[in-house]
Every structure is written in C-alpha cells, then in structure tokens.
C-alpha cells in the first residue's frame, strides 16, 4: 500500500464448505480460481508475531512459525511459469522482514513483544469474516507436470491456532525476598523444691531444680545478665549459703544441638542418648556427705549444750528436794517438842 512500504499483515483464507462439489477432488478446487464471495477469512496474523523462513528451496516450501511455538509448512501451488517469480518474491520478503526485526532489536533492549503490542492493534481471531470484494487473488493455472504432490504438502488454514490479546509486559523485580523478622521463642519449665527448717535437726533437703530452656542466640546475653544478678540472692525459706549454691551451679550440664541449649541443674537428669547420665544414688550420696560434714560440728555442739542443761536441771531438782526434806524434819521435831512440853505444864 502507499502508507506501508513493508507488509505487516498476513491474511489466510479458505473456501466455504458449500463452494466445492463433493465429486470434485480437493487439489483441483484449490488450484481453480474461486469467486470472491466463496472465500472466508480465517486468520489475521501480524507479521511481527510470525517468523517466516525458507524450509526447502528446491521444492519451494516455506515455514511459518507462530509465537506460541507451533510451526506450519506452506507449499506454493501455482502454474510453472509463475512459480519461480512467486517464490523469489517470498524470499525477498523474508529477507526484508528479518532485516527489520534486527533493526528493532538493536534500537531497544526491551522485548519486541511489549513494543509491538503498544503500537499495533490486534483484532480478535475468533471472528470469521466473509470477504465479498477479494480481488487481489492471482488466477492459478492447471499444470500437468505437478499434480497431487502439491496437495500432499498443502495445509488447511482452518487448523491455525487462535491469536489471543497481548497485554503490556511490566518489569518485575528479580530476586526480591521480603524481609521476615526473626522469630524469638523462649520456653522455660522450672520445678523447684525449697528446703524448710526442721525442729528436730533432721537432714535438710537441698534446693534442686530442673530447667529446660530453648533459646535463640540473641537472648543468651540477657539471660546471662539476669543470672549474674541473681547469684548472690537467696530465696526465702532456703537454708543454703552462697558456697553450696555455687557448687550446685558448677554441677550443671550443657548439651548444645545447633541453636538449642538444654540446661540441667540439680540432682535430676533427663535420660538421653546424647549426654552421659550419672546415677541418682551417687549424686545424692555426694550431696548428703557434703551437708553432713558441714552440719556435724553444729549437731555436736547442740548435743553438748542439751546435756549440760539437763545436768543443771537435775542438780537443781536434787538440791531443792534436800531443802524441803530438812524443813519437814524441822517441823516434825518442833511438833514433838510441843507435844512433850504440854503434859508437864498441865
């Protein structure tokens, strides 16, 4: 046309079902010149979405590849005198289209698909239109030398896939991962038995605890600071000094599995396959020996004081009894003397 020097649209059409007689062979109906009112437009393909190439130059066969990846092969069916001219026109058109595509790719690095959709209006391919004034069809002639072999390689254009509407392509950020805040979970289970004072100086139960802590790395420092503050503070009702408390803390066992720390304090231990577990009897004996060694001098001193107080009480009791016996004897003697003196006076 006068406005477009380079063709940009490819029209495909086929005969209407009623235009061909049943007795007429298919290749004869394709090579004859059909009237314009018997042609039906099946495809409206912009050449920007189609890749044309020469598949077989000897047999004058072309290849049409769509954007979807599906490929078709076209065989020229015309008279012998026009075959070379028509095929040379197709070859020139293919080279021209390839040059234009190369120029477009050099100008912009953006995908050619988005640029074409912004500048070209694509009509829906599902609409089937009857062309009443289709006068640009060349009149083919029957050639005796080439017969059914052309029909074998021809294609039914009604089987073309539909072209869907193409929207603009927007750039998406690559490798963008949303920042997820760290999840901090601290689970602590504590079981503590406090010792109480016994009046009869029996064995005092030691404070024991079992602590299971699941910590993240960022909370270890805060926990350590809290533990340092509580080192020199004794819980009420617990008869344990700072020395024994530090000894109990030294006996704690740590087992680290990646970011999880298991802390076991006191005499109780969990039966696991990861840490060697000491027998409960041995640990209890060691703790009892320590407490007995610390408390034996106190028990001895209290026992001596109790014996001295008892001896003092018995001595005071015996002395009081002797004084009372003497007073009773003195009273008896006085009564006897009075009784003896009364008859003499009478």
UniProtKB/Swiss-Prot annotation:
Keyword Transferase in the entry? The reply is: no
Superkingdom as given in the UniProt entry? Eukaryota
Membrane-spanning segments: none
Entries under InterPro entries matching the protein = GARIL-like_Rab2B-bd
For this UniProt record, the keywords arranged alphabetically read as follows: Cell projection, Cilium, Flagellum
The answer to whether the entry has keyword RNA-binding is: no
Single GO biological process annotation from the record: flagellated sperm motility
Subcellular localization, as worded in the UniProt entry? Cell projection, Cilium, Flagellum
Region annotated Disordered sits at 275-346
Q: Record's GO cellular component, any one?
A: sperm midpiece
Biased composition (Basic and acidic residues) is annotated at: 283-297, 334-346
Residue pairs linked by disulfide bridges in the UniProt entry: none
Q: Which family does it belong to?
A: Belongs to the GARIN family.
The record's PANTHER family line, in alphabetical order, gives: GOLGI-ASSOCIATED RAB2 INTERACTOR PROTEIN 2 (PTHR22574:SF6), PTHR22574
Query: Partners and quaternary state?
Result: Interacts with CALM1.
State what this protein does.
Seems to play a role in sperm motility.
Q: Name it.
A: Golgi-associated RAB2 interactor protein 2
Protein's organism:
Macaca fascicularis
